[in-house]
Amino acid sequence: LNRHTYHAVPGTEAIAPSVPRLCTLRLKGIDRTIVLPDDPELVEALSSCIHGWPSDLQPLDPATLATPDPSALAPLCVIEPRGPGIYRTHSRYLDRPFDKLPAATAICTLLADLSQAYSETPGDHVFGLHCGAVTICGTTLVLAGARRAGKSTLVARLSAFPEVDILCDDVLPIAADGRAVALGLAPRLRLPLPEGASPAFRQHVTRWLGPADDRYGYLPTPNLLSHGKTVPAHVFLLLDRRDEGPARLHGLTEDETLCRLLERSIAGPAGPEPSFAAAHDLAKRLTGLRLVYSDLEEATTLLLRHFGRLGEDRQDFGPVSPPLAPTAPESPETPAEIDQTMPFVRASDAAVRRVGDAAFIWRPGDVMLWHLNPVARAIWAMLDEPAPATLLVEVLGELFPDETPERLASDLQGLMARLCAEGLIHPAG
């Protein structure tokens, strides 16, 4: 990050400032600023996670806080110091701030905002994908899978090899010609590492681990592609992690490739219809493959051998096994019922994240866990304060007089039980 010296107002050196010294960060292509503390450790940690994205860091004049410019756009994100190494973050995409965050989690919320803002801003892309992406000897793989399929861990493991370049582990912009665009944001790794992680993987993480806390850490390895670098996309790789069995590659039908790609699409700056058309065109260009695996090292070795042998000839990605039957969505386990008279409240580390007209329950570092329809969003809003299901049913009964109380109570019971099982709400007190 390009850093400029903070210039204090002459004659005020002995006066304790009413607010901490702050900076504004601007990144090329993003029309809103980021406000953060003038804290060298935080700035250095953030800088280590952003590779090649032109930026400008300037001191924020305290006078502008008292008399803000009414014509200026509100900041994209504000990181507020709350004590040594602790921060509160405010985002234009979230319905509430996150408080008491360590530096790595505060950086996580900021990078999520940057990814979303870039996806919405007109530029060199038409839509985005929630996915990981790497190149192996010049072949670009778009990696996606169900939650807990091991995407981020696989990207991190592959980052240890010199024949691999890293594009992303979360959001991948796609240009009109189908090329993948690197954002230059370091991949994030779930911590602690799995018990079965190999010594080589542990050594790699120890060497390159950047900002980290007890849940996640960033891995700014030298093979992270710079912001704006584009490469052709070749393969859509669906991750299918299982409890046992050897690593193997299967073909993926065109229909399932398209379906899985659309599931992970993020509407671009022109809106959903052009994004859908571009995603459809991309699916036609990509070869769809399924990676079935249970062991991370086996999967890594298989990918390196399979794609490393291709060289410049990428017309044939075989031999692979025949396609499997399309994977049915996993049926979630029925959660235990909750006491409908017990007050519940939202978890402090969860908030509503807005993406266009849609809303999701989101946690820093996690995927967007829950899509909220209007009714669920109203329930989530009411749980900002402790409330039992019995009270919520009464309110819903006024909003939906045609529904029976029994039906409303049953639906609400199921929703709150699932939210509780995920740790998104908990008993108050």
List PLM regions with ranges:
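Long, basic/Gly/Ser/Thr-rich N-terminal segments
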Residues: 1-110, 114-117, 301, 305-317, ...
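Long, charge-rich, low-complexity alpha-helical segments
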Residues: 2-5, 314, 365-429
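Glycine-rich, often acidic-flanked micro-motifs
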Residues: 3-23, 38-46, 130-132, 136-146, ...
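A structural signal for short hydrophobic beta-strand segments in well-ordered beta-sheet cores
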Residues: 79, 133-134, 171-174, 352, ...
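P-loop NTPase catalytic core of nucleic-acid-dependent motor ATPases
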Residues: 108-144
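Conserved lysine of the Walker
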Residues: 151
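Post-Walker A alpha-helix
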Residues: 154-155
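Low-complexity, glycine/alanine/valine/leucine- and proline-rich hydrophobic stretches
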Residues: 252-269, 353-357, 363-381
